Amino acid sequence: MVKVTLVTAQWCHYCPTAKKVWRDLKDKFNFEYEEIDYESPEGEKLADKFSIVSVPTTIIDDQIVFVGVPDKDKASKTLEKPV
């Protein structure tokens, strides 16, 4: 199963829009989804592992796929094909 991880921050003005994109797609596609706060211990580990310097950042199956708010159509196409 595809795993989508969205790295966000409370102070991020674009993160609510990115969350909405992935939550809406969750209703259409079958994938595992989690939201991780950039400033949490888990978020800090992901930031180190993937050299994340900007939020929102979307990681799909252990690869950064989107930095910033993903376009819903592009995100849909990403979920339709293997990453």
Task: Annotate each PLM feature.
Residues 13, 41-42, 73:
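Short alpha-helical
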Residues 60-83:
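Non-catalytic, surface beta->alpha helical segment in thiol-disulfide oxidoreductase systems
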Residues 1-27:
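Local sequence-structure signature of Cys/Sec-based thiol-disulfide redox active-site neighborhoods
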